[in-house]
């Protein structure tokens, strides 16, 4: 019984830590959105935010993230999508990134879709 209780507590702490990390990332993303209303001006802010929360995973994620931000910005600059659509696309990409099992492959596929 004690082992089950201990495992339950550890599991809850782990889930809480993951949820807290996601919440902090989303809060920082919203701060970037408030400071830089235009997605195209928020590239450095979003990049630093991503790097802060995913740096322990892989430097390759950071490079791919930068390519994705630039691709979304290019679509906005060329009037293929609006600023609001750019923010929504970014939010969906990050949400799906968090839930994907093969994160590198997911980011690579996103890059190809955005081109």
For the regions a protein language model found, what residue spans apply to each?
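Amphipathic alpha-helical repeat scaffolds
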Residues: 33-34, 73
């Amino acid at each position: 019984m004690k082992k089950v209780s201990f495992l339950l507590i550890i599991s809850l702490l782990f889930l809480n830590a993951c949820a807290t990390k996601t919440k902090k990332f989303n809060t920082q993303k919203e701060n970037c959105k408030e400071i830089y209303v235009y997605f195209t001006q928020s590239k450095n802010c979003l990049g630093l935010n991503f790097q802060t929360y995913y740096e322990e995973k892989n430097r390759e994620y950071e490079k791919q993230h930068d390519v994705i931000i630039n691709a979304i910005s290019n679509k906005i600059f060329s009037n293929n999508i609006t600023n609001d659509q750019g923010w929504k696309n970014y939010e969906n990409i990050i949400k799906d990134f968090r839930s994907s099992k093969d994160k590198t492959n997911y980011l690579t596929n996103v890059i190809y879709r955005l081109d």
